[in-house]
Amino acid sequence: MKITKIKVENFRLLKDFSIDVENKLSLIIGKNNTGKTSLLAVIEKFLTEKSNFSIHDFNLDEQEKLKALEKKEGISIPEDFKFSIYLLFEIKYDDTDNLRNLSSLILNLESENTVVLGFEYYLNPIQFKYLIDDFVEFKSE
């Protein structure tokens, strides 16, 4: 079993990011402030108990989208407004892998296949209230 692709949307510097993971070795190399740490941070936030997202975790474009909703008397949220962070793993497996942890996700019995695991952090109306409070604090900084 092997992760072959990682995709991230709307997390810090990673607006629409994907990386193909090589068979032997994959290196994440780049200049400062290009998203290397953000990639590891989003994986950690979704896969560990450190899943405390804040306004600062959302991509700057998403923060601007939220800021555009601001009115003089508060923030008005349209019903179709989507505010989320997304992480996706593509995992290839074959008949030699132990599939116990993935068996409920497998839809066919072919020997070579791919399973896609997606994680999404999105805000429901109650969470929007907390986000608005964070946003007011963010705006005052």
Region annotations inferred by a language model:
Residues 53-55:
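Internal alpha/beta loop-helix hairpins
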Residues 57-88, 92-141:
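Glycine-rich phosphate-binding loops of NTPases
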Residues 1-48, 59-69:
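Pre-Walker A-like glycine/lysine-rich segment at the N-terminus of P-loop NTPase domains
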